[in-house]
């Protein structure tokens, strides 16, 4: 029996490239043995609703084609359900942090090859209050860069748009009082920003979590304490090399459950999109989603080798 795949795509991502190549993508998947259909999103929340519908219709595979925001919506559509379909990823956004972490090719046909080859691995996701995320949650003015950067600037200079906007915001940054409880420990004090990471790639910084594991059941918690502009610039430089973890203003920990609160009205960034405001409870859901990934990911330190699943297409 042929497997059924549903593509959920953002038609505006990647300068509408996927929309143009959709017919070829459908043909490629059909030749590989999939009965395939596609759905184009029109507004925020569409990908979540369509993922839920596809689950009810018992699709074997869901393919998210778009940026990290589209992927986040698809994950939110399936995370609470039993017998979740496998997830395929076609990175079409500006940064594509999750795709980077799993070494998924940025070209459409290369990403489809990963799905067709059939190798998959289970990865952790995070639950924040009543929603889910697959890459990161963060707070602090600098973390607002990804959803405050103009779309036109992103289309012109790509990922560099975030750095341009980030440097523009640096002088405005202010520390806020935070209480962060994590696995029996407590941080209480002034901080500029915090990150909860599930992968090694956040906002294009591929060494922000140098010891990341995608399936170990732990968040990486990074807290940047109150710092002056020179100190913050130094931390960012170190972060580009994965050398920030020992900086005296950086707290770097692993935790399964985290609670964050503040008297300040602090916005949250979840997978690159606006995620509401504090307070927030975070829980790591270990190996919760089964994702297609290149076979060589088994040789990477990001994945525990004894967890890797080799699930090939049944012809």
Curated annotation (Swiss-Prot):
SMART domains: DAGKc
Originating gene: dagK
Cofactor note: Binds 1 Mg(2+) ion per subunit. This ion appears to have a structural role and is required for catalytic activity.
PROSITE patterns: DAGK (PS50146)
GO CC term (a single one): plasma membrane
Protease found in the keyword field: no
Function of the protein: Catalyzes the phosphorylation of diacylglycerol (DAG) into phosphatidic acid. Is a key enzyme involved in the production of lipoteichoic acid by reintroducing DAG formed from the breakdown of membrane phospholipids into the phosphatidylglycerol biosynthetic pathway.
Domain named DAGKc: residues: 1-132
GO biological process: phospholipid biosynthetic process
Identification of the protein by name: Diacylglycerol kinase
Binding-site residues, ATP: 10-14, 41, 67-73, 94
Binding site for Mg(2+): 213, 216, 218
Active-site residues per Swiss-Prot or TrEMBL entry: 273 (proton acceptor)
Keyword field: ATP-binding, Kinase, Lipid biosynthesis, Lipid metabolism, Magnesium, Metal-binding, Nucleotide-binding, Phospholipid biosynthesis, Phospholipid metabolism, Transferase
């Amino acid at each position: 029996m042929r497997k059924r795949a549903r593509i959920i795509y953002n038609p505006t991502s990647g300068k509408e490239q996927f929309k143009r190549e959709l017919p070829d993508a459908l043909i490629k998947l059909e030749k590989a043995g999939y009965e395939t259909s596609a759905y184009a999103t029109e507004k925020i929340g569409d990908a979540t609703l369509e993922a839920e519908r596809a689950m009810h219709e018992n699709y074997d595979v869901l393919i998210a084609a778009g940026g990290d925001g589209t992927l986040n919506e698809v994950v939110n559509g399936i995370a609470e359900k039993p017998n979740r379909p496998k997830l395929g990823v076609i990175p079409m956004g500006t940064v594509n942090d999750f795709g980077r972490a799993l070494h998924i090719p940025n070209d459409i046909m290369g990403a489809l090859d990963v799905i067709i080859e059939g190798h998959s691995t289970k990865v952790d996701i995070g639950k924040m209050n009543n929603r889910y995320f697959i890459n990161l949650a963060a707070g602090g003015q600098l973390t607002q860069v990804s959803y405050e950067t103009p779309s036109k600037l992103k289309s012109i200079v790509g990922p560099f748009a975030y750095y341009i906007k980030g440097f523009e915001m640096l002088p405005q940054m202010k520390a806020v009082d935070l209480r962060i409880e994590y696995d029996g420990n407590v941080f209480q004090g002034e901080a500029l920003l915090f990150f909860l990471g599930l992968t090694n790639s956040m906002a294009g910084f591929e060494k922000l979590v140098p010891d990341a594991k995608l399936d170990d059941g732990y968040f990486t918690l990074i807290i940047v304490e109150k710092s002056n502009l020179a100190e913050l610039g130094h931390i960012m430089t170190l972060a580009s090399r994965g050398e920030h973890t020992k900086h005296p203003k950086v707290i770097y920990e692993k935790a399964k459950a985290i609670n964050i609160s503040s008297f300040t009205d602090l916005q949250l960034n979840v997978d690159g999109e606006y995620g509401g405001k504090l307070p927030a409870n975070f829980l790591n859901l270990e190996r919760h989603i089964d994702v297609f990934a290149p076979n060589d990911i088994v040789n990477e330190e990001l994945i525990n080798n004894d967890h890797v699943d080799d699930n090939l297409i049944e012809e």
